[in-house]
Amino acid sequence: MARIAGINIPDQKHTVIALTAIFGIGRTRARAICAATSIAETAKIKELSEAQIDTLREEVAKYLVEGDLRREISMNIKRLMDLGCYRGLRHRRSLPLRGQRTKTNARTRKGPRKPIKK
């Protein structure tokens, strides 16, 4: 198994699909990485040479992925909460942020129903 950005990449999959195992790299970015490194998208990871894997590592290192990306996302949410803006308040109350209705839906975000105590 090749190790890129601290993640074990699956050997049996095509390069584009295998790169999506890294948090922060989707299909589009994986295709861009393959194009930049001139590695065929359909080539499997086990078929790549060590030099090609190194070029993949260097190209992935240019992007914000895995722990750094998770940290930045959580810091952005924390900043919104500290500002006290509408989105920050919605995060704090665990409610939907983008204007969805909450009277009947939003069960995923709100969690299980809490019974009314009598």
Curated annotation (Swiss-Prot):
Family annotation (Pfam families): Ribosomal_S13
Region (Disordered): 94-118
GO biological process: translation
InterPro entries: Rbsml_uS13_C, Ribosomal_uS13, Ribosomal_uS13-like_H2TH, Ribosomal_uS13_bac-type, Ribosomal_uS13_CS
Family annotation (Gene3D superfamilies): 1.10.8.50, 30s ribosomal protein s13, domain 2
One GO location term (cellular component): cytosol
Source organism superkingdom: Bacteria
GO MF annotation terms: rRNA binding; structural constituent of ribosome; tRNA binding
Keywords, comma-separated and alphabetical: Ribonucleoprotein, Ribosomal protein, RNA-binding, rRNA-binding, tRNA-binding
Entry similarity comment: Belongs to the universal ribosomal protein uS13 family.
Its biological purpose: Located at the top of the head of the 30S subunit, it contacts several helices of the 16S rRNA. In the 70S ribosome it contacts the 23S rRNA (bridge B1a) and protein L5 of the 50S subunit (bridge B1b), connecting the 2 subunits; these bridges are implicated in subunit movement. Contacts the tRNAs in the A and P-sites.
Quaternary structure annotation from Swiss-Prot or TrEMBL: Part of the 30S ribosomal subunit. Forms a loose heterodimer with protein S19. Forms two bridges to the 50S subunit in the 70S ribosome.
Record-given protein name: Small ribosomal subunit protein uS13
